[in-house]
Amino acid sequence: MKDRLQELKQRTKEIELSRDSHVSTTETEEQGVFLQQAVIYEREPVAERHLHEIQKLQESINNLADNVQKFGQQQKSLVASMRRFSLLKRESTVTKEVKIQAEYINRSLNDLVKEVKKSEVENGPSSVVTRILKSQHAAMFCHFQQIMFIYNDTIAAKQEKCKTFILRQLEVAGKEMSEEDVNDMLHQGKWEVFNESLLTEINITKAQLSEIEQRHKELVNLENQIKDLRDLFIQLSLLVEEQGESINNIEMTVNSTKEYVNNTKEKFGLAVKYKKRNPCRVLCCWCCPCCSSK
């Protein structure tokens, strides 16, 4: 019998060399494919102008929050005594500033919505600039909405204080009136309380009359402020309805992306598992046809 041990050893070495060469070639090919599928970051246009406008708008919202807080602190000092003209003048200045700032911020937020739609058309809804503008608008809009709610609650509380003070002063003077009567007089503008005939009839002092008149003026100013706030809240409600669908779409996109990533991870795991079980990658015998052919 012919001794073929040396031939077997030589054949085994050739198979090992062929297998190592095949593995290195496969890894190189896989690495090449992976590099082609690597994440390539988009070159987004520079958004310096948008960032500058957003920063400016954020500063305006912060200033509005400071003025609303200042207005609320002034209302805490509301007492039954006669208020000085300087305090009333200062309060009137603050309310005017709040109104001007709120209208400016509302217009700026509307302009930002237009910029978002423009960016969606030019750069696409998934571009970096579009996503930055959307997130910034949502954050600033919520902040602005909270500030206006606080301002509205402060005005409503002040209105109730003024009505309570007028009722108390009339009660002290001997003129009993219900809160509904005061509300009707306020809405209808029939303030016969301030006539000289009533002053003589109930023996009300001029100081008390002056105080009631002052509260009446404050109530009238509050009515005008509430009307302005109502217009702003109507515009805010329209913005909420318009942006609500966009927020829902963003949430659905994020959830679908999360599910897609999880599915991709599972597929990669299965791919690695099947790769290890590939019969062409494992040598069962040195004379395997698939290996010898290579």
From Swiss-Prot:
Subunit structure: Interacts with EGFR.
Membrane topology: Peripheral membrane protein
Compartments in which it is found: Cell membrane; Cytoplasm
Domain t-SNARE coiled-coil homology: 209-271
The keyword Magnesium is assigned to this record: no
Keyword presence, Coiled coil: yes
Any GO BP: intracellular protein transport
Keywords: Cell membrane, Coiled coil, Cytoplasm, Membrane, Transport
Predominant location category: membrane
A cellular component term, taken from the record's GO annotations: presynaptic active zone membrane
Domain of life: Eukaryota
Protein family: Belongs to the syntaxin family.
GO function terms (MF aspect): SNAP receptor activity; SNARE binding
Alphabetical list of InterPro entries matching this protein: SNARE (IPR010989), Syntaxin (IPR045242), Syntaxin/epimorphin_CS (IPR006012), Syntaxin_N (IPR006011), T_SNARE_dom (IPR000727)
A Pfam family reported for this protein in Swiss-Prot or TrEMBL: Syntaxin
Protein's name in the database: Syntaxin-19
